[in-house]
Amino acid sequence: MIIIPCTDRKRQVPGPKLLARNLPQGSIDNVAQNWAKIINSSSHSFNANQIYCGRPFAEALKAANACQAKLVVVSAGLGLVDMHSKIPTYGLTVAERHSDSVSNLVTIDSWGPSMWWASLKKTNVGTFDFSDYFEKNNPSLILVHLTRQYARMVYDELACLSSDKVSKIRLFGLGLEEFIPQSLVECLMPYDHRMNGPDSSNRGTITDFGARSIWHFVQLLKNKELETGSLSQHKKLAEGALSDWKMPVKPNRQRLTDEQVIDFITRNWSAVSGGSQKMLKLLRSSGNACEQARFKNLFHEAKKKSQVQLGLPL
């Protein structure tokens, strides 16, 4: 089984009702209940593999097909979603500074990613119990990629896993040690920034790091004997493959404030014809630093600002 976090890139465009930004504000439980009602009343659905897209999904799907594994997406809006599930296209995230973030909606009491998962778990909108899901599917090996935000969201689920289930997990991600239960720290595989170094044939962004690492690891598992190997055997296998790889040369870029990034985008809008990826490339080639997910949100803010200034509809 391969598990990856959801991204906001989707092939199908969500209707207004299925965007979190249009939900009423309230307590975290009220927001979760309202979200569940909207999802359950949606009349249009697609196979999950017709909705999710982007390089992280493509890399994970490639890995799943290569080893005939079930591919599962951890969704902040729907729980655990396998690729044969029928789901509506939607827009909801636990990432802050996003127009469809749950953080914009919870105005009563406090909120956090794990609290949101717990609130959704009390509804009938999807599957949220990791332990039950692993029990029903009984995978021999579980390859999991998590970002820090998603690790925070499913922390309690991971903490409840029995030792026999933990022994099946191989965890892929950068800087997760402080965001996962102590029982899973040992499960972290030795993949790091060498995946973007000069010796890697599959370089990419931080966003697709985990999926690229899983694909690399799957290629090392060339037979069933390796698939059923122990955690220590698998870590040695991966480290052996990476041992001669060099770290990438880190460019010396200046980190800009949010306001400076927005100003850069606004000033250079016509130079790249308003293209997001071209704009990020231009910003970085100009000696500036900005993480991809952060840039995406700031790009949308700058776009809205430009539309307002020009008197165009949002």
Q: Where are the regions that the model predicts?
A:
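A structured, charge-rich N-terminal accessory region that forms the first stable segment of a protein
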Residues: 1-50
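A structural signal for short, well-ordered beta-strand segments and their strand-loop junctions
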Residues: 2-4, 70-75, 82-83, 143-145, ...
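Long, charge-dense
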Residues: 77-130
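A charged, amphipathic interaction segment
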Residues: 125-197, 256, 262-266, 273
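Glycine-rich, aromatic-bearing surface loops/beta-hairpins
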Residues: 167-240
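Basic, amphipathic alpha-helix used for nucleic-acid engagement in HTH/winged-helix/SANT-Myb modules
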Residues: 220-263, 308-314
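Positively charged, polyanion-binding regions of nucleic-acid-associated proteins
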Residues: 252-274, 286, 299-307
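DNA-recognition alpha helix
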Residues: 276-288
